[in-house]
């Protein structure tokens, strides 16, 4: 097993958040996570009130951790409305796809989600990015799609310096590393709609345990699936995890 390149390409990481008073970084380190940040220290952004850490798990998968400082940030993340009440101080906020062509991949997901990105930025070269990625003169451009009303997002990121390379691997659903699922309320209708958009699935929807799923590749070769819970009110549905209404 090798460490995932921090510049991508592919589904680079998942992101975990917590309030600033929680030992988020320490919990991951105790389980063998290795910090990627320069000097092995969190990188704090006073603009956003967030402390950031990139790290590798014991198998070399990349992950991001964010400590949120302030009530407004926690409310925006859904913590005060959901996780705090359930005594769950750590939650996953996003999946991140690193790509050699951000705009192309964002157009692909725009067609899938039928919604516009809620934010697009370019992060200039500077000490913040250098320390976060442990790369001199790092420069990235990023866009985000909201996947529910508030707290869950998809991040699409392109390194401009050094440039994110093209993927040279054809991934399968069983390949090592990350894939992600998009929960839907009518999987047959979404399966047919996405097929009409030209998306190639590995198979029609199939019942796998508590879910009906159909796996596909996006235009960068990332593996994702549509999934619909057999019991829409069951404990493993998005509705159960997100009391604000799900995706």
Regions found by a protein language model. Give the residues of each.
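Short beta->alpha transition motifs characteristic of CBS
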Residues: 65-72, 160, 226-233
